[in-house]
């Protein structure tokens, strides 16, 4: 297992940066509108646990898959960001269920290995346009909730996006202590 996780964390990282559409800043908060192409993703759902615990569990499942826990025993390397679909509660926390997603590396998009863990699904996802804001550090639930509120305030009432969920994104392996990149994404309504 360590070998699988080591490969997924220390192998090459394929970054999915998206295409910048526009940038803005309001009240000291920078935000961007970006477009991301569709493709194949792996996903897993974890429920009944606090956000931080559920996120870690889901991420570990996906790391095992890209590290070789699949029908081809293929160590695929890592992609970023890790995306966590989160569902806000009325009390400024996140519900105890998450969906963790990771884009399958480009060389495996046409024929991805089948997961050996039946809690992992392969999904075809459509292209999306989204609004994002970035922050550093080791992100926890409170950080994502705070930055989601800031992004919501920046966008105001006239910009339309999905409000029933948002995406919490991390770009860095856990052993990177400085210069960490985290983002909150709101998916634009078409």
Curated annotation (Swiss-Prot):
GO cellular-component term (any): cytoplasm
Source organism, top-level taxon: Eukaryota
Task performed by this protein: May bind free porphyrinogens that may be present in the cell and thus facilitate removal of these potentially toxic compound. Binds with a high affinity to one molecule of heme or porphyrins. It binds metalloporphyrins, free porphyrins and N-methylprotoporphyrin with similar affinities.
Matching SUPFAM superfamilies: Probable bacterial effector-binding domain
Domain comment as written in the entry: Forms a distorted beta-barrel structure, with two helices that are packed against the outer surface of the barrel. Porphyrins are expected to bind to a hydrophobic patch on the outer surface of the beta-barrel structure.
Keyword Cytoplasm: yes
Annotated localization: Cytoplasm
Oligomer status and interactors: Monomer.
Main location class: cytoplasm
Pfam families for this protein: SOUL
Keyword vocabulary terms for this entry: Cytoplasm
Protein name: Heme-binding protein 1
Family: Belongs to the HEBP family.
MF terms (GO), sorted A to Z: heme binding
